[in-house]
């Protein structure tokens, strides 16, 4: 494969040498000193460098909007980037990456800066900028030609066009990019074309206000100019008497844009921001060719690397036959763990599952740990031990349980985890006494934390992973009630597109949380975890288990109960009675989470949202949610035991409670 690619790669590099000179030039940039400056090698500089380096590997996002933060506290770098709604995804990511690199060279010491390109905008700051309307700083790009006809006719046509686009953009919804284009008949037999766009993190009202402010600036910045851009951090608008955007159906984000028309040859543009004037790149054709060649090279390289990566992952999965785990720095002596747990005494036993028991331990330095000791006669447990260790050792996220190390001695297999004092989520939400500690704010925090942990597994980690056993007993809570996903013994690597399903004849997990297509047909994908997450959300809200659920009207399971009440307009019947007595109770937010939960358990796999969409819906309270379709009704009162079953054979079952564990299996 590599031998076939090398000649083509060489040719592409040679062609690139002749086209690289035509790189796009930013329309304008502003370096702000309001929030202070930084120096080289400081924490802020390091975080900014990490942020800029990550831009070239952004995941494809259909709305072209990214909110990324790196670092902590005062040295945290927050960024927002957005592409114009008619820009293809490949071009979008390239534009953002280029904008980031360019901005740090133009603003080398400022902690806050923004840059505008024709196809994207990028900004960063050490303050919070997400979910905030910002109309300053602003800039405008204008043509040099004036309209020479009747002023009143021009202004009437232009205002009518932009006001109409503004009204549509402010209600079109975040999933549609808040991007609208349109045209109208202008004076002197001309057609006026317009474009408006808001960032999707602001509300409908803020979008409308931002665009209104932009329209109000036109008389002072762009009076009678035949073609202008007016841009701020939260929105932008543009107009011209020619089609300057790629025509797309804004009701269909996936539609393919056509080739844009070119403006008149004698049209030039200038930038106005204070006393600044900056020209717009003229070599558009050469720049486009350069970008196309670079994109082609990247595509070929990605294909090659993905083939190599799949081979490496297959090799790593086959390494279970090798007893020697190379990460010696994480290895504990068996005697150390034996002493820490008082020889695995009953007093220190925290719980037990199908593959062994979990014990609390204290190391000689006072550090508390949780030790998972696999059963000596469980061959399947040995396989799970290696699988879990090799996977979890590579994962680092605040919403995943932290693996501290392992121990192998003779037939002994042990995993060492951080100790979490509040044990597992099921001990709280299913207990009427402990449930009093879970106010709505805490439950919402847990829902959001689990969602972000799953997003990391599905999309942001080095290895894309399906958990396959997400449930309340596998969500551990630290002293601040921060949720941490545990139990990766059932997890699987998944290095292909998330819309594609895999098949297995080994069904593992817990009934009530398992997606029907997985239980009945052995199909699993990232949407399998999404289904489990939806069940968990409904359990957190109701304080009831999906499996074995019962209510006054005796409906079979929690999902059925939630769906029926949703359709009847009384979804709040689902809510835990304890919550309704608490000061933090918020019916609007609870209704929103019920909606999200039902979206996640929809019967059709393709209609379930990705975890990236779920996190966006949870973080963006103004995002309009779609109406859920019929859920996958699936009612079982038993759980699959930790001994897995095969399709076509009777599954060994055990009581639901006996399958819950305090720490990962």
From Swiss-Prot:
Residues 305-665 are cytoplasmic. It catalyses: L-seryl-[protein] + ATP = O-phospho-L-seryl-[protein] + ADP + H(+); L-threonyl-[protein] + ATP = O-phospho-L-threonyl-[protein] + ADP + H(+). The modification Phosphoserine is found at residue 473. The chain crosses the membrane at residues 284-304. Residues 23-283 are extracellular. Residues 647-665 have a biased composition (Polar residues). The modification Phosphotyrosine is found at residues 417, 518. Belongs to the protein kinase superfamily. Ser/Thr protein kinase family. CRK subfamily. This is Cysteine-rich receptor-like protein kinase 26. It comes from Arabidopsis thaliana. The lineage of its organism: Eukaryota, Viridiplantae, Streptophyta, Embryophyta, Tracheophyta.
């Amino acid at each position: 494969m590599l031998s076939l690619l090398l000649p083509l790669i060489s040719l592409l590099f040679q062609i690139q040498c002749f086209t690289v000179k035509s790189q796009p030039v930013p329309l304008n940039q502003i370096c702000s000193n309001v929030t202070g400056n930084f120096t080289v090698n400081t924490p802020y500089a390091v975080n900014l460098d990490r942020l800029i380096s990550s831009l070239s590997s952004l995941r494809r996002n259909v709305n072209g909007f990214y909110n990324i933060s790196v670092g902590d506290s005062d040295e945290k770098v927050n960024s927002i980037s957005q592409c114009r709604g008619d820009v293809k995804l490949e071009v979008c990511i390239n534009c953002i990456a280029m904008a980031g690199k360019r901005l740090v060279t133009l603003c080398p010491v400022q902690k806050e800066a923004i840059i505008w390109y024709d196809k994207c905008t990028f900004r960063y700051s050490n303050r919070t900028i997400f979910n905030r309307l910002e109309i300053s700083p602003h800039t405008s790009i204008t043509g040099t030609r004036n309209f020479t006809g009747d002023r009143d006719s021009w202004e009437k046509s232009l205002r009518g066009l932009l006001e109409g686009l503004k009204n549509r953009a402010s209600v079109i919804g975040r999933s549609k990019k808040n991007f609208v284009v349109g045209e109208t008949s202008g004076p002197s037999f001309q057609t006026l074309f317009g474009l408006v766009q808001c960032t999707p993190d602001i509300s409908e009202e803020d979008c409308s206000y931002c665009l209104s402010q932009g329209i109000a600036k036109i008389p002072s910045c762009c009076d009678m100019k035949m073609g202008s851009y007016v841009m701020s951090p939260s929105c932008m608008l543009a107009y011209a008497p020619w089609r300057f955007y790629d025509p797309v159906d804004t009701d269909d984000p996936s539609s393919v844009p056509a080739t844009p028309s070119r403006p008149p040859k004698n049209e030039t543009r200038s930038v106005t921001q204070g006393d600044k004037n900056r020209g717009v790149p003229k070599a558009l054709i050469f720049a486009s060719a350069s970008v196309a060649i670079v994109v082609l090279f990247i595509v070929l390289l990605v294909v090659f690397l993905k083939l190599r990566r799949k081979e490496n992952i297959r090799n790593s999965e086959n390494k279970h036959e090798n007893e020697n785990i190379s990460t010696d720095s994480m290895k504990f002596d068996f005697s150390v763990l034996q002493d820490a747990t008082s020889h695995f005494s009953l007093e220190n036993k925290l719980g037990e599952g199908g593959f062994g028991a979990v014990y609390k331990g204290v190391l000689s330095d006072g550090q508390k740990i949780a030790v998972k000791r696999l059963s000596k006669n469980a061959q399947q447990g040995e396989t799970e031990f290696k699988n879990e260790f090799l996977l979890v050792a590579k994962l680092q996220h605040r919403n995943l349980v932290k693996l501290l190390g392992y121990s192998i001695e003779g037939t002994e297999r042990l995993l060492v985890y951080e100790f979490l004092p509040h044990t597992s989520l099921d001990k709280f939400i299913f207990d009427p006494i402990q449930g009093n500690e879970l106010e709505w704010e805490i439950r919402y925090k847990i829902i959001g934390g689990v969602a972000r942990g799953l997003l990391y597994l599905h999309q942001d980690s080095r290895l894309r992973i399906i958990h396959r056993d997400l449930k309340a007993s596998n969500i551990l809570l630290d002293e601040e009630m921060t949720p941490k996903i545990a139990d990766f013994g059932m997890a699987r690597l998944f290095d292909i597109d998330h819309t594609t399903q895999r098949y297995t004849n080994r069904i593992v997990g817990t009934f009530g949380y398992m997606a029907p297509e997985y239980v009945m047909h052995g199909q699993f994908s990232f949407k399998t975890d999404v289904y489990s997450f939806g069940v968990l959300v409904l359990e957190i809200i109701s304080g009831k288990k999906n499996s074995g659920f019962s209510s006054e009207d005796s409906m079979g399971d929690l999902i059925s109960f939630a769906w029926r009440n949703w359709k009847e307009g009384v979804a709040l019947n689902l809510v835990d009675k304890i919550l309704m007595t608490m000061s933090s109770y918020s019916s609007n937010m609870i209704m929103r989470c019920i909606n999200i939960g039902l979206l996640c358990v929809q019967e059709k796999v393709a209609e379930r949202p990705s975890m990236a969409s779920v996190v966006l819906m949870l973080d963006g309270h103004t995002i309009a949610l779609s109406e859920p379709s019929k859920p996958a009704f699936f009612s079982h009162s038993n759980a699959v035991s930790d001994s897995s079953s095969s399709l076509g054979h009777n599954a060994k079952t055990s009581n639901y409670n006996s399958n819950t564990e305090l720490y990962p299996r």
